C-alpha cells in the first residue's frame, strides 16, 4: 500500500477498459454468491476466493494449505492464493460485457457530457442508447447526415433504397463509434473560430462544448471511455454478506445489482451465440444497459430498481452521497477507540484545568497504560496476567491507575460542538460514582448545564497528542473566546449572585463607620457579628496589600466595605483595589475620594455619601479581561478559581431566594391601562368614521399598548426595592431581566399569533394576578411558536455553519507578510445616528496600513505596519480621527490563505497569530456558533412594507448565499443629482441626472423613497429603503464597495442581537466569496471565455502572455454564495464531500483533475495530518527530544504553581 504521507497529490480520471482489466484479479462469470449448504463462496461467483482472496487468514478454499508457512502459495486444487483475508477489501474483479454500455453519469448528468462532446441533445442520445432510434454513423454517398436519427421505419426504407452504402446502428455501440470518430483538435479549433462571431444561445452552447472538449484534450482521457466494455466489480468486503441470528443472510444491495448485470450479460452472450433474431438481442441489450445504470446510479433514469418491501436499492453512487455516504460517514467522521461518554455533574471543588473521571471509566480508557505499568512495576509477569488483574479489578490496579492518569490530559467534548471550545483538555482526577465532574466555569464555553447533559471523553495517546492537548487545549488556556477576544469563562448564576451580594453597600448597616487596623481585624469583627458584609467601614490603607497605592495614600484610611475587602483579596497584588464598578478604577487606580485623613470624622463622611453600586456580571467580566491583559493565563485561571469559590460561598451565606411576596403588584397599573383603553376607543371611533385606514388603526392600537407596557415597566423597576431578591438576581446579571419582571408583576403585554402578526388584544394581567382563560389561550400561540422556531433554528444554524466551514476550510495563515500595498479604509459602522460598531472595536488588534496622524497636532499616533493595541486605539478614537487605513484579509495577496499582518491579532490568545493557524475554520465557527441565538423570523408589525426586511438568521443566510434580498432596494448606477421624482400610473419614477446622461428608475409598488429632488447621489447608493443586492452592487461599483457592504450588513444583524464578532472573521468569509473571476475575453491566453477562474490563476495566465508581448485576457469579478463557492473550489475531494457528489466527481474525472491537498478536508479524507498548526510542512521537520524528569518538574512548576 502507498504510505499516506508520501504522496503529493491525488488525481482522478476516466478508466480505460485495459485499466479496468489491469485492476482485476479475475472475471466474475456467475451470479452466485455463496453455497447454501457449505456457506463457502461459489467458484467464479461474486464472492469467489480465487478472484478475491481467501476468507480465512492463510487458508485456501479446499483446505489443502493452512498456516502462515505457505504464504504466497497458490493451491493447485482450488487455485486460491494463501494470504491474509484482508485482501478481500482491496482485490477487484471484472465482468466482460457482451455489448458496450453507456455510463449513466456522463450521459445523464446535467449538462450531459456525452451530448456536449457529440453535439447531440440528451433526448436524442437517450433514444439511441435505449434502442428507440437508429443513428447514422457513416453517411457514405447518401443524402443522410452523420448523427442523424432514424426511426425503425425510416431505417428500413433507406436500407432498401441505398443498400449498405451507409451505416446506422443503435445502442451504446453506435455512440461509441461516434465518440471514436471525433477529432478533438479539429473540433476545438472550429469552436474557437465560432466563438469569435457567435452570440446569445449559440455562444453559451459553444462555450460549454469547448470546456468539455478542452478537458478531454488536456487530460488524456478518451471520449470513448465514457462507454463501458468492461465493468469493474468492487471487493467483496465492501459489499459484505453476513449471516443473521436466524440463519438468514443480510446482504449489501450492490450484490443484487451485480447479480442482475451478470444474469443479463450471460443471457445476452447465449443469445448472441445462438444467433437470435435482432429484436430479441436488442431487448436484451437494453435490459443490460438498464441493469448497469441501476448499479452505477439507481433511480437516476426511470423508476429505481426495488428490493423487498419496495425499497429502492442503494447503488454505487448512493454509497458516496449524503450524510450516510462514504465521504461524510466514514472519511470525514470516524468513530474512535479510547473514548467513553457519561452524564455530567458539577464539580465545584475542581481547579480550572481538572475534571472528575469515574473510576471504572478511567480504568477502561487507560487499560493499555495500566497494563504496561503493572508489568514494569513487577506486579504482573506479562501483559496477559496484567489484563486478567484489571478484569478482576484487584486493589493494586487502582494505585497504578492513579499514577498513570497523573500528567495525562483527556479531552472532553459536548455535542453539538459549535466552536472549538466544544472540545477542551483537562487533567483527570478519579471520582467515585459513574458521572463525569465538570468545572462550573467551563460550562459557558460548552453551553452545558447539569440537567442530564452527557459528554464524551477521549484519550490522546501519542506523546505529541498529549503535548498539544496540554499546551493548546487545556481549559485553563482557553480563557478568551475566539469570536470576539472577550473572556468566555465569566462566572454565571450563583457565582455572580454571590459576588454581587458580597460587594453590596448598605446605608446604616450595623457598625457603620468603624475603623480597623487591617483586613483581618475587619473579618474578625464580621465573624463576631459587630459588622455586616455590607457595612461601610474604614481600614488603614497601609495594611491593605496593594502595590498601586501611593505613599501619601498609604498614610490615610481607605473607605470600603467588609465584603469588598474580602473580594479584593482574590486579585493579584499589583492590581488596583476595586472599590467601585468603573473602568477608571479597573484600569488605573482606586479613586482618591475613597481615601480620608486619619482622625477625620469617619461616620459623618460615610453618612454624607451615596451607596456605591455592587459588581454585576459585566464588571466581573471586565475584571477578568483586565487581569488577563496584565498577568496572562496562569494568574487569571487562579483568580477565576478564587472568584468561583467566593461566589458559591457567599451566595450560600446570602440565602437569597424567591417567594411570592417578593413580587409586588404595581398600584398605578389600573389607571395606566384605563388611559390606554380610552385612547384605543378613540382610535376605533376615528376608524369607524373613516378618518383612518385599517392599517393605521392597527398600528396605532399596537403602539398604544406597547407604550402602556413600557410605562408600567418603568414604574415597576423604579418601585422595586434594591434589596428585593428578584431585583438583585436581575441587576447582577445572574438570571432574569426587566421584561420577566414586567410579566410577573406588571402585565404580559402583546402576543403574536402563529403567523407572527401581533394580536391587538393585550394580556392585561400579570402572572402574579393570574391570567383569564382567554389570555391564557392567546399566550399559548406565542409559546408554541417559540418552541417550534427554536427547533428549526438549530438545524438551520447548524447547516449554515457547515457551509461556512466548507468554504473557508483552506484559509490558513501561510506567511508573515504578503507585502501588499493596499489596505481597507474603516470607520465606525452606523445605522442612522446609532453606532453599531465603534472605530475602537474595529481597530484593536489590527495592523495599520498607513501612518495615522493627529488631525490637529499632526503628531504620529500609529506608524505604518504597527499593531494597534487597546491603548493606541483609545488614543486614535479620542483624537477625532474618523477613518483609518488598516491591513485586512480583503486586500491580502497570500495564496490559499492570509498572512500574519493582514489578519492581525489572534483573538483567542490576545497575541500575534501564528503561521499555521486555521483562521478559516475559526472564522466559520465564530459566525456559525451564535447563529442559534439569532431570531428566526421578524415579527410582522402589521402589513407595513419596508418594516418587514429580513433580520436574524435568514438575513445572514441571504447575505452569505448572495441571494436577491427580500425587500430589495433600487440603487443608482451613476453619480449625479436627483433631477425629479414623477408619478406614473400607480408607481413612481426617479430620474438621476449625471454629467453625461440621465437614468430613470422605476420604483416598485410599496417601496419607500430615501431621496428627495435636488439631492446629490453617488453610484451604488440606494434610492429606496431596503437591502441592496450585492451582485447588482458589484456590477455598478468595485469589489471594495461590495466587501465593505457585506461586512457592514453581517455586523448589523449580529450587533442588533447583542452578539459581538470580530470583523476579521467576516472578512475571511467574504474574501472566499469573491475569489473567482469570470473570463469575458480570452485574449491570446489559454483560458476559455466564460469560465470561472481563481483570481491568482487568472493573473498568472495573463502574466505569462504579457511577457511574450501578446494580448492578455479580461475578466469580471464574480460574487458567489458560500454553497456555490464551496463547489467551485480547486479541490474536488473537498467539493465532492460537501454536496452534489456525483456532479463534482463526473466533472473532475473528465478534466482529469489533480487535488493538490492544500485544504484541511482533503487531507482528513485521505488520512494525512492536516496541513495546519504543527501539521504544516515547516513544522513537520522538527525532531522531538524526550525531556528528562528534571526538565518536566521545572516546566510544571511554571505552568501550575498551585498543584
Curated annotation (Swiss-Prot):
Give the Gene3D superfamilies listed for this entry: 1.10.132.30, 1.10.150.390, 1.10.1790.20, 1.10.40.90, 2.40.40.20, 2.40.50.100, RNA polymerase II, clamp domain (4.10.860.120), RNA polymerase Rpb1, domain 3 (1.10.274.100)
Q: Which UniProt keywords apply?
A: DNA-directed RNA polymerase, Magnesium, Metal-binding, Nucleotidyltransferase, Transcription, Transferase, Zinc
CDD domains, alphabetized = RNAP_beta'_C, RNAP_beta'_N
Top-level lineage group: Bacteria
Gene Ontology terms, cellular component aspect? Answer: DNA-directed RNA polymerase complex
Q: Which residues bind Zn(2+) 2?
A: 818, 892, 899, 902
One Gene Ontology term of the biological-process aspect is:
DNA-templated transcription
- Comment on bound cofactor: Binds 1 Mg(2+) ion per subunit. Binds 2 Zn(2+) ions per subunit.
Query: Recorded GO terms, molecular function?
Result: DNA binding; DNA-directed RNA polymerase activity; magnesium ion binding; zinc ion binding
Task: Please state the Enzyme Commission number of this protein.
Answer: 2.7.7.6
For this protein, the record's InterPro entries field holds:
DNA-dir_RpoC_beta_prime, DNA-dir_RpoC_beta_prime_bact, RNA_pol_asu, RNA_pol_N, RNA_pol_Rpb1_1, RNA_pol_Rpb1_3, RNA_pol_Rpb1_3_sf, RNA_pol_Rpb1_4
Q: Which reaction does it catalyse?
A: RNA(n) + a ribonucleoside 5'-triphosphate = RNA(n+1) + diphosphate
Residue positions annotated to bind Zn(2+) 1 are 60, 62, 75, 78
List, separated by semicolons, the cofactors it needs.
Mg(2+); Zn(2+)
Q: Which residues bind Mg(2+)?
A: 449, 451, 453
Q: Which family does the record assign?
A: Belongs to the RNA polymerase beta' chain family.
**What role does it play?**
DNA-dependent RNA polymerase catalyzes the transcription of DNA into RNA using the four ribonucleoside triphosphates as substrates.
Database matches in PANTHER family: DNA-DIRECTED RNA POLYMERASE, DNA-DIRECTED RNA POLYMERASE SUBUNIT BETA
Its quaternary organisation is: The RNAP catalytic core consists of 2 alpha, 1 beta, 1 beta' and 1 omega subunit. When a sigma factor is associated with the core the holoenzyme is formed, which can initiate transcription.
- What this protein is called in its record is DNA-directed RNA polymerase subunit beta'
The organism of origin for this protein = Bacillus cereus (strain ATCC 14579 / DSM 31 / CCUG 7414 / JCM 2152 / NBRC 15305 / NCIMB 9373 / NCTC 2599 / NRRL B-3711)
What gene name is given for the protein in this entry? rpoC
Amino acid at each position: 500500500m502507498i504510505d499516506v504521507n508520501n504522496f503529493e497529490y491525488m488525481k482522478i480520471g476516466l478508466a480505460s477498459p485495459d485499466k479496468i482489466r489491469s485492476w482485476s484479479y479475475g472475471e466474475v462469470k456467475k451470479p452466485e454468491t455463496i453455497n447454501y449448504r457449505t456457506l463457502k463462496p461459489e467458484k467464479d461467483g461474486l464472492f469467489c476466493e480465487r478472484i478475491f482472496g481467501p476468507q480465512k487468514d492463510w487458508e485456501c478454499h479446499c483446505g489443502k494449505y493452512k498456516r502462515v508457512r505457505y504464504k504466497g502459495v497458490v493451491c493447485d486444487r482450488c487455485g486460491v492464493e494463501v494470504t491474509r483475508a484482508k485482501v478481500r477489501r482491496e482485490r477487484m474483479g471484472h465482468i466482460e460485457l457482451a455489448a458496450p454500455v453507456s455510463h449513466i453519469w456522463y450521459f445523464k448528468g446535467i449538462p450531459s457530457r456525452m451530448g456536449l462532446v457529440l453535439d447531440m441533445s440528451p433526448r436524442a442520445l437517450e433514444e439511441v442508447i435505449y434502442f428507440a432510434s437508429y443513428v447514422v454513423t457513416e453517411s457514405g454517398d447518401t443524402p443522410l447526415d452523420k448523427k442523424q436519427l432514424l426511426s425503425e421505419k425510416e431505417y428500413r426504407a433507406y436500407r432498401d433504397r441505398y443498400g449498405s452504402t451507409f451505416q446506422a446502428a443503435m445502442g451504446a455501440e453506435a455512440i461509441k463509434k461516434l465518440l471514436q470518430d471525433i477529432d478533438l483538435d479539429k473540433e476545438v479549433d472550429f469552436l474557437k473560430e465560432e466563438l469569435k462571431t457567435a452570440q446569445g444561445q449559440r455562444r453559451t452552447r459553444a462555450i460549454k462544448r469547448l470546456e468539455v472538449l478542452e478537458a478531454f484534450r488536456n487530460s488524456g482521457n478518451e471520449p470513448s471511455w465514457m462507454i463501458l466494455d468492461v465493468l469493474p466489480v468492487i471487493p467483496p468486503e465492501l459489499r459484505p454478506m453476513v449471516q443473521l441470528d436466524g440463519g438468514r443472510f443480510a446482504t449489501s444491495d450492490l450484490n443484487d445489482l451485480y447479480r442482475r448485470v451478470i444474469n443479463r450479460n450471460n443471457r445476452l452472450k447465449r443469445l448472441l451465440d445462438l444467433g437470435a433474431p435482432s429484436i430479441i438481442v436488442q431487448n436484451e441489450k437494453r435490459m443490460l444497459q438498464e441493469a448497469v445504470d441501476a448499479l452505477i446510479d439507481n433511480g437516476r433514469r426511470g423508476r429505481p430498481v426495488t428490493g423487498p418491501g419496495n425499497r429502492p436499492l442503494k447503488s454505487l453512487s448512493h454509497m458516496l452521497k449524503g450524510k450516510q455516504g462514504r465521504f461524510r460517514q466514514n472519511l470525514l467522521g470516524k468513530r474512535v477507540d479510547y473514548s467513553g461518554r457519561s452524564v455530567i455533574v458539577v464539580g465545584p471543588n475542581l481547579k480550572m484545568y481538572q475534571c472528575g473521571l469515574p473510576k471504572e471509566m478511567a480504568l477502561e480508557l487507560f487499560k493499555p497504560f495500566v497494563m504496561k505499568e503493572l508489568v514494569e512495576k513487577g506486579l504482573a509477569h506479562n501483559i496477559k496476567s496484567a489484563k486478567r488483574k484489571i478484569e478482576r479489578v484487584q486493589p493494586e490496579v487502582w494505585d497504578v491507575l492513579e499514577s498513570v492518569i497523573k500528567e495525562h490530559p483527556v479531552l472532553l467534548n459536548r455535542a453539538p460542538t459549535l466552536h472549538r471550545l466544544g472540545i477542551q483538555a483537562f487533567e483527570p482526577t478519579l471520582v467515585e460514582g459513574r458521572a463525569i465532574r465538570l468545572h462550573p466555569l467551563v460550562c459557558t464555553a460548552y453551553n452545558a448545564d447539569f440537567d442530564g447533559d452527557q459528554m464524551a471523553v477521549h484519550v490522546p495517546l501519542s506523546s505529541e497528542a498529549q503535548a498539544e492537548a496540554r499546551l493548546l487545549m487545556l481549559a485553563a488556556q482557553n480563557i478568551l473566546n475566539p469570536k470576539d477576544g472577550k473572556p468566555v469563562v465569566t462566572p454565571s448564576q450563583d457565582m455572580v449572585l454571590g459576588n454581587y451580594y458580597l460587594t453590596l453597600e448598605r446605608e446604616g448597616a450595623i457598625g457603620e463607620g468603624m475603623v480597623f487596623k487591617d483586613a483581618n481585624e475587619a473579618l474578625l469583627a464580621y465573624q463576631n457579628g459587630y459588622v455586616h458584609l455590607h457595612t461601610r467601614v474604614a481600614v488603614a490603607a497601609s495594611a491593605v496589600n496593594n502595590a498601586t497605592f501611593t505613599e501619601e495614600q498609604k498614610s490615610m484610611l481607605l473607605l470600603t466595605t467588609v465584603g469588598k475587602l474580602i473580594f479584593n483579596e482574590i486579585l493579584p497584588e499589583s492590581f488596583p483595589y476595586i472599590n467601585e464598578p468603573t473602568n477608571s478604577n479597573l484600569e488605573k487606580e482606586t479613586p482618591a475620594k475613597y481615601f480620608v485623613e486619619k482622625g477625620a470624622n469617619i461616620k459623618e463622611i460615610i453618612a454624607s455619601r451615596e451607596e456605591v453600586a455592587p459588581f454585576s456580571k459585566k464588571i466581573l467580566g471586565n475584571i477578568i479581561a483586565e487581569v488577563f491583559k496584565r498577568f496572562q493565563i496562569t494568574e487569571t485561571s487562579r483568580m477565576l478559581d478564587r472568584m468561583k469559590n467566593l461566589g458559591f460561598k457567599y451566595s450560600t451565606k446570602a440565602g437569597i431566594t424567591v417567594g411570592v411576596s417578593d413580587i409586588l403588584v404595581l398600584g398605578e397599573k389600573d389607571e395606566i391601562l384605563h388611559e390606554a383603553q380610552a385612547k384605543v376607543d378613540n382610535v376605533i371611533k376615528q376608524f369607524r368614521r373613516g378618518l383612518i385606514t385599517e392599517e393605521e388603526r392597527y398600528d396605532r392600537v399596537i403602539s398604544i399598548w406597547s407604550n402602556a407596557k413600557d410605562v408600567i415597566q418603568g414604574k415597576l423597576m423604579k418601585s422595586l426595592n434594591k434589596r428585593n431578591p428578584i431585583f438583585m438576581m436581575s441587576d447582577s446579571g445572574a438570571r432574569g431581566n426587566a421584561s420577566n419582571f414586567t410579566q410577573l408583576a406588571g402585565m404580559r403585554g402583546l402576543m403574536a399569533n402563529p403567523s407572527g402578526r401581533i394580536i391587538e388584544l393585550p394580556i392585561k394581567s400579570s402572572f402574579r394576578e393570574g391570567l383569564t382563560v382567554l389570555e391564557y389561550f392567546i399566550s399559548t400561540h406565542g409559546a408554541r411558536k417559540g418552541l417550534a422556531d427554536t427547533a428549526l433554528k438549530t438545524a438551520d444554524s447548524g447547516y449554515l455553519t457547515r457551509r461556512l466551514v466548507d468554504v473557508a476550510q483552506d484559509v490558513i495563515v501561510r506567511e508573515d507578510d504578503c507585502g501588499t500595498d493596499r489596505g481597507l479604509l474603516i470607520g465606525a459602522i452606523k445605522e442612522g445616528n446609532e453606532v453599531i460598531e465603534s472605530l475602537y472595536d474595529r481597530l484593536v488588534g489590527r495592523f495599520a496600513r498607513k501612518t495615522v496622524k493627529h488631525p490637529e497636532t499632526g503628531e504620529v499616533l500609529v506608524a505604518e505596519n504597527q499593531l494597534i493595541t487597546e491603548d493606541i486605539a483609545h488614543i486614535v478614537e479620542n483624537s477625532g480621527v474618523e477613518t483609518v487605513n488598516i491591513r485586512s484579509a480583503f486586500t491580502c495577496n497570500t495564496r490559499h490563505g492570509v498572512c500574519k499582518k493582514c489578519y492581525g491579532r489572534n483573538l483567542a490568545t490576545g497575541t500575534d497569530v501564528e503561521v499555521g493557524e486555521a483562521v478559516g475554520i475559526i472564522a466559520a465557527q465564530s459566525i456559525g456558533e451564535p447563529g442559534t441565538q439569532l431570531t428566526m423570523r421578524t415579527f410582522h408589525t402589521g402589513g407595513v412594507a419596508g418594516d418587514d426586511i429580513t433580520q436574524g438568521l435568514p438575513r445572514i443566510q441571504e447575505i452569505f448565499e448572495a441571494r436577491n434580498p427580500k425587500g430589495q432596494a433600487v440603487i443608482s448606477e451613476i453619480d449625479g443629482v436627483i433631477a425629479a421624482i414623477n408619478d406614473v400610473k400607480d408607481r413612481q419614477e426617479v430620474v438621476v441626472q449625471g454629467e453625461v446622461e440621465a437614468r430613470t428608475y422605476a420604483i416598485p409598488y410599496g417601496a419607500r423613497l430615501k431621496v428627495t429632488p435636488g439631492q446629490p447621489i453617488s453610484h451604488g447608493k440606494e434610492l429606496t429603503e431596503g437591502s441592496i443586492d450585492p451582485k447588482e452592487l458589484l456590477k455598478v461599483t468595485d469589489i471594495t464597495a461590495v466587501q465593505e457592504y457585506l461586512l457592514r450588513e453581517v455586523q448589523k444583524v449580529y450587533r442588533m442581537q447583542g452578539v459581538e464578532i470580530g470583523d476579521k472573521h467576516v472578512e475571511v468569509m467574504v474574501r472566499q466569496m469573491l475569489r473567482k473571476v469570470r473570463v469575458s475575453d480570452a485574449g491570446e491566453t489559454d483560458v476559455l471565455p466564460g469560465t470561472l477562474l481563481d483570481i491568482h490563476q487568472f493573473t498568472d495566465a495573463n502574466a505569462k502572455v504579457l511577457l511574450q508581448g501578446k494580448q492578455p485576457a479580461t475578466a469580471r469579478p464574480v460574487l458567489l454564495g458560500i454553497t456555490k463557492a464551496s463547489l467551485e473550489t480547486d479541490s474536488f475531494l473537498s467539493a465532492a464531500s460537501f454536496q452534489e457528489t456525483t456532479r463534482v466527481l463526473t466533472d473532475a474525472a473528465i478534466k482529469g483533475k489533480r487535488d493538490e491537498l492544500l485544504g484541511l478536508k482533503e487531507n482528513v479524507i485521505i488520512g494525512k495530518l492536516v496541513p495546519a498548526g504543527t501539521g504544516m510542512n515547516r513544522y513537520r521537520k522538527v525532531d522531538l527530544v524526550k525531556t528528562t524528569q528534571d526538565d518536566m518538574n521545572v516546566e510544571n512548576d511554571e505552568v501550575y504553581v498551585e498543584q
